[in-house]
């Protein structure tokens, strides 16, 4: 895993989002419209986070998933920044800010799923081979 100084120098946008809890512009991230099968990993530490099997089109402007690949891969934190009350999602392994989770995902088996709204820059897709 790269140090914060290395991260800041090599990828300032990733540093801003992952370490300063920033948000990338909507509809600009490289994975918003991605359809490839694979596993999305943390761009900071390479931990497995989200499977493409749970990715869906939310029209929010960010990649959205119904569940992490493993609930133990992420941690959830109260976020009241910007005058809003939200639930922040972080990588459990390195603490990188990934995005937020909302309770307005698609319906499955008569229940509304969560919508993990994740910044593309915080992810690295490793396609299935």
Where would I find each of the regions flagged by the language model?
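A short Gly-Trp-Pro
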Residues: 1-129
């Amino acid at each position: 895993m790269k140090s914060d100084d290395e991260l800041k120098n090599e990828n300032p946008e990733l540093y801003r989002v992952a370490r300063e809890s920033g948000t990338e512009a909507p509809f600009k991230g490289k994975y918003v419209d991605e359809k490839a099968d694979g596993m999305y990993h943390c761009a900071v530490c390479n931990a497995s986070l989200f499977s493409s099997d749970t990715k869906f089109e939310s029209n929010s402007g960010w990649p959205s998933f119904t569940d992490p690949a493993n609930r133990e891969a992420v941690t959830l934190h109260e976020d009241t920044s910007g005058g809003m009350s939200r639930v922040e999602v972080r990588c459990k392994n390195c603490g990188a800010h990934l995005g937020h989770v909302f309770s307005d995902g698609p319906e499955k088996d008569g229940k509304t799923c969560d919508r993990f709204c994740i910044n593309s820059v915080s992810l690295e897709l490793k396609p299935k081979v």
